[in-house]
Amino acid sequence: MKDVVIVDCIRTPMGRSKGGAFRNVRAEDLSAHLMSSILLRNPNLDPNEIEDIYWGCVQQTLEQGFNIARNAALLAGIPKQVGAVTVNRLCGSSMQALHDASRAIQVGDGDIFIIGGVEHMGHVPMSHGVDFHPGMAKSVAKASGMMGLTAEMLGKLHGISRQQQDEFAARSHRRAYAATVEGRFAREIVGLEGHDASGARFFYDYDEVIRPETTVETLSQLRPVFDPVNGTVTAGTSSALSDGASAMLVMSADRAKALGLTPRVRVRSMAVAGCDAAIMGYGPVPATQKALKRAGLTIGDIDLVELNEAFAAQSLPCVKDLGLLDVAEEKVNLNGGAIALGHPLGCSGSRISTTLIHLMEEKDANLGLATMCIGLGQGIATVFERV
């Protein structure tokens, strides 16, 4: 099979969903901005050679409906003969897009793909139009569709304290802010115009969502939001609501070499796995175990890890059971994560992969793991290797 390489990986800034920077920017525009940026950044690439575009999005309705991948591609000026499809594996959608493109390359169904994803959670809320089949109650508790309650359950099962959650969340903001002021995020962000609080046009090239003033002390004052009586999960220890997009240029190694394009990493292995919907946040553990086995690796071989921070109460059990607790400060989410940046559902898979790849280059790391939980009990994971 052909080797799959990532040639470029970028993202938009993350904007607050409630009256934030992109309140007047549509999801298609966020997506098209990155698609066109991929082409501008890689002039050796003839866009007519692109086989297909795989674009993750969860709430495929309103401005995100009717195949947003194709709509955005047309807005971006991608040649009309290039296909585009919207992919949905809930939180793992854009990582699934990467997996789909990778498999297509491996079996010879194309050499050049753009992948990515978007979610404008300010324009299309996560719960918009959701209508679960009543019959699901026979096998899945109703609370399993409420992500915050599944985090509460997972945290309780693993003995995760409120203090631990607050410390993890404060770390996320602290590290994300440091990555901003030290210019590390600038390497992955492609800025675009939005509107500031007064309504004036403003060019955003930084994440609006990070709260640098966040401390364990301020977080400790917040009340539990999902289980007000017995819970420990607060808004501050949950991933923020944000709007954003991410994208990658994925190619066969042979075609990248022929075009004189330098690969950043290769896709070493991929996996998805299911778990109990009541503890959906545990999905990264079985997915990672599968991906490592397929790569012939152990967790000790992995130099850097990006774990999507849906909730602190969800992330910490995964870190613990993956055997990363003692090395988390050196290996896991070194630039913070979704608690600070937000989790625009369809965007996050390629967003965390993009951050990971840039960190691997910065730290001269050989092997990296990107993994995330998925609503209703799934996990997805990708192992990357420097080339």
UniProtKB/Swiss-Prot annotation:
First-tier enzyme category under EC: transferase
Chief place of localization: cytoplasm
The keyword Cytoplasm is assigned to this record: yes
EC number(s) reported in the record: 2.3.1.16
Catalytic reactions on record: an acyl-CoA + acetyl-CoA = a 3-oxoacyl-CoA + CoA
Annotated keywords: Acyltransferase, Cytoplasm, Fatty acid metabolism, Lipid degradation, Lipid metabolism, Transferase
Subunit structure: Heterotetramer of two alpha chains (FadB) and two beta chains (FadA).
Name used for this protein in its record: 3-ketoacyl-CoA thiolase
Species per Swiss-Prot/TrEMBL record: Aeromonas salmonicida (strain A449)
Gene name, Swiss-Prot/TrEMBL: fadA
